[in-house]
Amino acid sequence: MNDSPVLVVGLGNPGPKYVGTRHNIGFEVVEELVGRNYANFSVHKRSNTEIAQLPGLIVAKPRSFMNLSGTPIRALCDFFKISPANVLVVHDELDLDFGQVKLRQGGGDHGHNGLKSTSRSLGTKDYWKLSVGIGRPPGRMDPATFVLKPFSKQEQDSVPIMAADAADLIEEHIRTL
């Protein structure tokens, strides 16, 4: 790892309307990561994010909507002088079964508008992505509707475990940089 910190960003939508929705699993994961380190988020006005600073690590939640996440992520990279190679974005993934997590560097956005925005703003797809599986919508439900719905009662019981597993993977990954 170089001298710049690692930036871990959880994607989600701001506001109480979106708490507990599938699209906000990125927020759940970074909240777990920050909470287990006894830290708190505070507003970082220059980037329109909430951040928590840990040793060698900045954890962030954009305060913009998911599809506009790239702008605040780029602002954090510029402010803290972080290269895209030291960025890890946590996002929901329809193409992974519920509860599965997958870490990859580079690659496509899989149709995820938050990742599209991030890639556009960073000028590269060569950053780390942690996909957290939310599964496919049932029947003919529109995926855009599905991701904005709350987790089912049964799924809600698994979300804290899922967030903890993803946070474990982030911590393990950071140790290897």
Curated annotation (Swiss-Prot):
Instruction: Please give the InterPro entries that the UniProt record associates with this protein.
Output: Pept_tRNA_hydro, Pept_tRNA_hydro_CS, Pept_tRNA_hydro_sf
Q: Which Pfam families match?
A: Pept_tRNA_hydro
Q: Molecular function (GO) terms listed?
A: peptidyl-tRNA hydrolase activity; tRNA binding
In this chain's numbering, which residues are marked as the site (Discriminates between blocked and unblocked aminoacyl-tRNA)?
Answer: 13
Which top class of enzyme applies to this chain? hydrolase
Q: What is its main location?
A: cytoplasm
Location of this chain's protein in the cell: Cytoplasm
Kindly list the residues the record flags as site (Stabilizes the basic form of H active site to accept a proton): 92
Entry annotated with the keyword Transit peptide: no
- The entry's tRNA-binding residues are 18, 65, 67, 113
Keyword Chloroplast part of the UniProt annotation:
no
EC number(s) from the headed UniProt entry? 3.1.1.29
Recorded GO cellular component terms are:
cytoplasm
GO terms for biological process? protein quality control for misfolded or incompletely synthesized proteins; rescue of stalled ribosome
Q: Which reactions fall under this protein's catalytic activity?
A: an N-acyl-L-alpha-aminoacyl-tRNA + H2O = an N-acyl-L-amino acid + a tRNA + H(+)
Which key words are in the record? Answer: Cytoplasm, Hydrolase, RNA-binding, tRNA-binding
Residues the record marks as active site: 23 (proton acceptor)
State the oligomer form and interacting partners.
Answer: Monomer.
Tell me its family.
Belongs to the PTH family.
Function, in words: Hydrolyzes ribosome-free peptidyl-tRNAs (with 1 or more amino acids incorporated), which drop off the ribosome during protein synthesis, or as a result of ribosome stalling.
Record's protein name = Peptidyl-tRNA hydrolase
Which organism is this protein's natural source? Corynebacterium efficiens (strain DSM 44549 / YS-314 / AJ 12310 / JCM 11189 / NBRC 100395)
Annotated gene: pth
